[in-house]
Regions:
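Conserved Radical SAM active-site core
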Residues: 1-145
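Auxiliary Fe-S-binding modules of radical SAM enzymes
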Residues: 47-49, 112, 134-247
C-alpha cells in the first residue's frame, strides 16, 4: 500500500562470535550462524510480501555470498575507507578487524566474481583526508571496472551518536560532503547511481543534487532509519518537489 519494493536487512558482522546472547538466540531458533538465519528471514519476507530483500550483513565468505544470492537480488557493504591509518589506536576503526579495507575489498571482489549486484560507498568525516577519500573511491571504481557489479555508490556523512566512543567527534561540513559527491560523480561518470542519505543532510536537497547525486537511496514511508533513528526520513512528496525544482 505504501509503494515499498525492497526490504533492507542490515546488521553487524557475525554477532554470534562476540556476544553470548546472540549465540543462545541462534541456538534457540535452530540456526548455527547469523547468516543462516538471515537467509531464512529474507526468504520468508520475500515469499510472504513480494518485497525484494537487500542484505547488508558486513564481511562474509564466498559460500555465504552464494547462500544469500539465492534469496536476495542484491547485497551490499560500505567500504568506508581504504585508510589503514584509521585502524591505529585512537582512530575510528581501531579494534574493529572487520573494518580492515583489505578484508572488505575481498568480500566485494568475491561478490563481483559471483555476479552479485552490490551496493557500496564511503563514510566521510571519520578522520580521513580528502586524498584518502579519492583512494577509497578509486578502489571501488577499480572493482567495478573489473566486474561491473556495483549498482550504487553511497557518500555518507558521519553523524555523532551519544554513548559511542566518537560521541564528541566533529561532524563533516556540508562543503566536505558536496566536494566528495562531486568527486565521485567525476570519477564514476554519468551512468553510476550516486546517493547521499537525505535524512542525514536535511534542508540541503538541492545542493546534493547539484553536486552530483542522482539517487535518494532507500527512503521508507513506513519504518524509521534504524541505523540513524535520530534522523527521520524526509517525506517523499518533499523529495519529489526538491528533485523537480533542481531539474
Amino acid at each position: 500500500e505504501a509503494g515499498c519494493q525492497e526490504a533492507l536487512f542490515t546488521l553487524g558482522d557475525k554477532p554470534e562470535l562476540r556476544y553470548t546472547q546472540a549465540r543462545h538466540e541462534l541456538e534457540r531458533l535452530g540456526y548455527e550462524t547469523t547468516i543462516q538465519y538471515l537467509v531464512a528471514a529474507a526468504e520468508a519476507v520475500r515469499d510472504a510480501t513480494g518485497l525484494l530483500p537487500h542484505a547488508n550483513p558486513g564481511v562474509v565468505s564466498r559460500d555465504e555470498l552464494l547462500a544469500l544470492r539465492a534469496v536476495c537480488p542484491s547485497q551490499g557493504m560500505m567500504l568506508e575507507s581504504v585508510s589503514r591509518r584509521l585502524l591505529e589506536k585512537g582512530n575510528a576503526h581501531y579494534g574493529s578487524p572487520d573494518k580492515d579495507p583489505e578484508v572488505r575489498l575481498e568480500t566485494m571482489r568475491w561478490a563481483g566474481e559471483l555476479r552479485v549486484p552490490y551496493t557500496s560507498g564511503i563514510l566521510i568525516g571519520i578522520g580521513e583526508t580528502r586524498e584518502e577519500r579519492i583512494e577509497s573511491l578509486l578502489a571501488l571504481r577499480d572493482l567495478h571496472d573489473q566486474y561491473g557489479h556495483l549498482q550504487e555508490i553511497i557518500i555518507q556523512n558521519f553523524r555523532a551518536k551519544e554513548g559511542t566512543a566518537m560521541a564528541q567527534w566533529a561532524e563533516p561540513s556540508l562543503d566536505e560532503l558536496l566536494w566528495t559527491i562531486a568527486a565521485a560523480r567525476l570519477m564514476f561518470g554519468p551512468r553510476m547511481a550516486i546517493q547521499a542519505p537525505p535524512n542525514l543532510s536535511p534542508d540541503t536537497f538541492g545542493a546534493l543534487i547539484q553536486a552530483g547525486i542522482n539517487d535518494w537511496g532507500g527512503v521508507s514511508p513506513v519504518t524509521p532509519d534504524h541505523v540513524n533513528p535520530e534522523a527521520p526520513w524526509p517525506h517523499l512528496d518533499l523529495l519529489a518537489k526538491e528533485t523537480e525544482a533542481a531539474g
